[in-house]
Amino acid sequence: MFTPQGKGWTGWSTPAPANQRSGGGAPAASAPLGKGKGTTLRVAELEQELHEYQYNMGLLLIEKKEWTAKLDEINQALTQKEEILKREQAAHLNAISEYERREESMRKALGVEKQCVTDLEKALREIRGEIAEVKFMSEKKITDAQSLEASLEEKRLEIEGKLHAADAKLAEANRKKSQADRDLEEVEARQRRLEKEKLYFENERKAGEDRIKRQEDSLRDWDKKLKESQNRILDLQRSLNDREERANENDKLFKIKQEELEEAKKALEHTKATLKIKEDDINKRLAELHLQEKEAESKNRKLEEREKKIAEREEKVSAREKVGLQKLLEDHNVKLESKRRDFDLQLENEKKSFDAMLVQKEADLVQREKDVRSSEEKLSKKEQVLNESKKKLEEWQNDLDTKSNALKKWEESLQNDEKQLSEQKLQIENERKQAEMYKLELESLKATVVAEKEKILQEQNNLKLTEEERQEHIMLTAQLKKEIDEYRMRSNSLSEETEDLRKQRQKFEEEWEQLDEKRTHLEEEAKKLNNEKKNLERWHDNEEKRLKDREDELDIKYKEQGENLALKEKSLIDNIDHQRLENEELLKRERADLQRNLQLHRHELEMEMEKKQASKERELEEKENELNRKMDFVENELKRAAELNESKIQKILLEKKQLQKEKEVLVEDRQKLETDKADIRRDIDSLNTLSKSLKERREAYNRDRNNLIDIFEKYKVCKNCGVIIFEGLDALALKDSTDIEYPSLAVEADDRSPNPDTLAQETGALVNSGGRLSLLQKCSRIFKFSPRKKAEQSSEQQAVKNTDFGARLEEASQSDDDYEPTPVYQVAYNSFDAEDLPSESGAFENEESERQDIADDVQMESSLGVADNCVDIHGTQSFDGNTDMVVDTTIVDVDQNGKDSAVLPVVDLEPETSKQGRRQQNRKGRAKGGVKRTRSVLAVVEDAKEILGENLEVKKDDGQGDSVTVGGTRKRRFAGATISEQDEDSEAHSESVSLGGQRRKRRQTAAAVTQAPGEKRYNLRRTTVANAATAAQTNKKKAAKKGSKQTVEATADDTEGTSKAEEPATGSKGASQSADDASQLPEYSQAEAGDTHGPVEVTSAEGVDIVDGIDAAPDAMPMTPSGSELGAEQDDEEDDDSERRNQSIGKKLWSFFTT
């Protein structure tokens, strides 16, 4: 500030005393005149001093006004800045809310796109299923066509044979003509079928075209949706970039305002320091001017030091700015390099994606080019936003890659469809060729007929026929004419059919041409895409050039900024020098003024200055406090805004991480889908192998069935006595040949069975039980056993449903590997051929079980005899709802050596709970064998009673034989089985044979018993050593049955009959066994009323000398305890109903056969 220069100070004026004379010796008379002059001078001086004081006060007032104006301006600037801060905060909050809303909209768009992807995947799956169905139908039709071809060839051969026979016999010509007519009718019917099949193929082709069109429409809609979503994304990116630009501009404004505030603070501090210095100087100048000068000098020194510090600070700031500029340049260069790499990667990805895109993406490419150009224009302003925008573009490109892969798959499916159409065309051409062959054959037939006609004419000329023969010949010729006319009609129809086939061929050729046109169209589109690739490469080069130009521009800008900073530094130094000079001038002026004014009115000025100082200090303190408060408020608000921005940035980063995680999850889901597809393909292959194995087994079943039919026809009548063994076989042998059940080919018929849980069970059961036992089922219809209920099957199915599909396939493959034909047919065949061969019990699952359980496995031995020829057939039928029967049969005959051996079926009636546990270990479809009684069986027993009479009653009373009754409960089973080893001169090998295709592994844990002398543990060979009494063994087995679980096996003791006289080889080692062995009655014991059924074994043998159950065999001890002994513990719980049910079916059958 400039102040006007006042007058120079003239020094202090002291008034002269009244007595002092000023003239040095003047007279007294001159004294009044001197006083007047002194007063006038004094008044003038006082007036001058007053003027000077007024002048100085005016100067002070002017300075005061100026300071107040400056304070008002600063206050206004602060208020304006506060308002601007509030507005910017409100705008920032609005921008954040809009950003959140757009993020929500983006998420919704992503969800919609995910739904579209899932819908497309579902559509692809449906298309593949339809393709599989079409393949399956085509394979079926191919097999039908092949069968038709075979039948047509056979018939053709028959027609040729008949035509050759017509030359020899004219009488048979009519028959052959009629047969030819029938064959032609069949050919016409087959041709009609072929026409229907052609129509069906055409309809299917049209339906396929419609589906393809629908798919194309859906893909077009999907592309439109994609375009819309891409446009939305680009709009959102633009808005985000605008907001980020605004935020950057606001940050720059904040920085500028902070710098201005700092400068204002520095100015205020400087002014405060100067004011304090002035006040101190004024207080000290009043006391000592010299001290003021020294203080001024010290202040000058301090100012110099401060100037030095300021210079040092400015140098540090300039160095920092240079370092910061270098860092910024380096970071900018690194970012540019990373951006270049990202652009390169993006361009490569875009090239890969554009290779698979179609013409429909041209509009998208144009829009993308425009968007990229706009984004490039914004890159110069938004260098910090490039990373985020690039990540979003990469995500979008990944989506495009997935969609392009889907389109590739769809194109592959279209190619497969084209291949199928070509195959169908070839098939139709083959059919047309076959029709032409048929036409040629008909023409050859016509030629043969004409030749026959000529031969007949020659014979007429050669032979002189009678009138009757002539009439017959005329009739024959008329018939031949009719047949010729019919052949002509048929040939015309065949020509029409050939024309239709030609028309169809033309249609197919037209369709093929359309497909060729489509291919050319696709090739053109590929060329367009290549051109677009070239354009993109050019665009990439242009972008690189632009980036280089921008880098140069940025370098120029940075240089200009450095120059501006240097100029600013110079201007600051000049301003500091100017202010220093002004301060020096002010000090000089103040010194002069103070030297003038303070010497005159020291005390007045002191009082006034003290008051003024106090008031000014108060005002300054108040203003300083207000300024400090405002600055603190502004700083706090700026900190809060920075914290809010940081928190929002962190939220955005977290959301980006979540999106990346979702991408990874989608990739994992796709990989899982691919693995599932591979597993499904493997399952399909395994099912095809199973279907082939089932076909082979069906052929084996047919062979075995034919062998059985041959055996039954050979041995329908007994060789010795001529008695008919199998009654009703003639009625059942061929009547129900159409009812023979084959194993179901459910796996072959449909790869997607509606009930896959029961697949392994059905395949296992049907493989072993379907085809071979049809005749045995017919034989078993004579006995009319009651079928099993469906509850057993439901329990089995519930146990199997919990298994996986892969496990059931493995089990089915294991059952294929373990398959062996059942030994019943070998037993029957060998028994009739009088060969003693022990049959195998079945295929065990483990070799160790075969080694450990040889003693417990039951063997069957068949032997022939002369005494009596009898067949003991014990059959059990189990119906499981699908009319699948399981029959247990045993065939008994008499050995040539005169020994009877009974093949004893063991009926397994274990509780269902235990069977379910066993099925969970071995999940193979096994049918249960059960015996139940129906009214038909009771009627048979009543008939037997009427015939036999008293003998039957005696057999009912005799209940102590070799039969065993076993009661089983749910918690434990009473093992009351005793294994009969050897009687005196007979050994019985019994084997449980289940003809339901099931070879069960039976484990029998027998209690440890002491062996009697001459007794053998295992029935492996024939022995003639007599057994001692085994009553002790039975008692021990009764004691051991409480802690062991066994299945009952009772072996009947074979005895010699009346064949001793006829065959002396047997000797007289044993007597005929009692009728206990023949009329043995198995009993059913129930531990809990009707809950469970124990296993029942029937021992039945027939001898010739049957007198009494006690007197006939005095030497033979019973090998097994009687049913009454074992059932003594359970008689209290049995009811009358259980006693009625416990009658022996074997006895009824024996009584039936004796009738």
UniProtKB/Swiss-Prot annotation:
PANTHER family: PROTEIN CROWDED NUCLEI 1 (PTHR31908:SF11), PROTEIN CROWDED NUCLEI 4 (PTHR31908). This is Nuclear matrix constituent protein 1a. Its main location: nucleus. Belongs to the CRWN family. Residues 1023-1034 have a biased composition (Low complexity). It comes from the Eukaryota. Residues 11-21 have a biased composition (Polar residues). Residues 1128-1137 have a biased composition (Acidic residues). Residues 1-36, 293-315, 910-934, 953-1155 are annotated as: Disordered. Keywords: Coiled coil, Nucleus.
